[in-house]
């Protein structure tokens, strides 16, 4: 039996009764080949569960094999499972990913919006396709992932909470889950901080202990986003126009730019323009024009609120009365105090206490009451 002193210091010792109860439950742990899922599997073992791993392949390699880490990740996942003495299953969800995540991603970019495919991947793949496969084909009572979130309550009463580590909290990416999905899922590393996760992996001598966290969109990897997108969507160059209606340059394609962007606009050397940096403040999709203004505090960068649609509430009950809470309009943002005003069951108006910069249509607005993630929706427009 592998031993980790770090684990023993940070997790309570379970009673024999708790261990015996857990021993009747089978958990399929998603193994990505990273340190978080590796340590998650170990924690579940220590808590007495019957643990098996599952490696998901969600993207078929293309010509850029340098950028696709699937083979190396699978090898790492297998090495960890061998060390822990658990079985590793493998499944290919590439077709489901293409149909339910990637095509939506392209459609949104084509429409000039900035989607978040990781949120859609969690909704359609990790907590739908994976959950169904684990339960129906592998006989799982629960699935587990290496996400930094916590769960309170069971089954019908399950709530999604922020991860204990504020620097790693991933509840923003999981707001589309229902209370039933949360109730069927375990999040072992959500109860600890990232340095402790790495320390446990070091104690165990896991191959993933020092492995760098993956960054960026999973199907793009480390390659340049612009180069990748150009392979699937033909770029449509157009004018860069100022808020004062002056054309001052050309853009390569609206899809390559996002609200609040400062770098990479190629604007410079303009007479009477001053020294302040230029920022993207809007996209005119109809005329294929990028709208820019000078200064990080330009009024056009700010919104007093937003309209959100495609709503998902974790308890699946729509909000029908005004609610004071907090919101994040992008990952790792500080919570913004706000009031939700329902328009109908599918749409809400959100008014911030103070104007916010670079609120981006296509991104998600995720709402919180203290530690509890209530759910969220897609930003349809700025106010």
Curated annotation (Swiss-Prot):
Keywords: ATP-binding, Cytoplasm, Disulfide bond, Nucleotide-binding, RNA-binding, Transferase, tRNA processing, tRNA-binding
InterPro entries tied to this protein: MnmA-like, MnmA-like_C, MnmA-like_central, MnmA-like_central_sf, Rossmann-like_a/b/a_fold
UniProt record, GO biological process: tRNA wobble position uridine thiolation
Broad EC category: transferase
Region Interaction with tRNA: start-end pairs: 168-170, 330-331
One Pfam short name: tRNA_Me_trans
Gene Ontology CC: cytoplasm
EC number: 2.8.1.13
TM stretches of this protein: none
Site residues by UniProt (Interaction with tRNA): 147, 363
Catalytic activity: S-sulfanyl-L-cysteinyl-[protein] + uridine(34) in tRNA + AH2 + ATP = 2-thiouridine(34) in tRNA + L-cysteinyl-[protein] + A + AMP + diphosphate + H(+)
GO molecular-function terms, A-Z: ATP binding; tRNA binding; tRNA-uridine 2-sulfurtransferase activity
Disulfide bonds, paired cysteine numbers: 121-218
Residue sites binding ATP per the record: 30-37, 56, 146
UniProt-annotated location(s): Cytoplasm
Superkingdom of source: Bacteria
Region called Interaction with target base in tRNA, residue ranges: 116-118
Active-site feature positions: 121 (nucleophile), 218 (cysteine persulfide intermediate)
Function summary: Catalyzes the 2-thiolation of uridine at the wobble position (U34) of tRNA, leading to the formation of s(2)U34.
Family: Belongs to the MnmA/TRMU family.
Matching HAMAP family: tRNA_thiouridyl_MnmA
Full protein name: tRNA-specific 2-thiouridylase MnmA
Organism of provenance: Haemophilus influenzae (strain ATCC 51907 / DSM 11121 / KW20 / Rd)
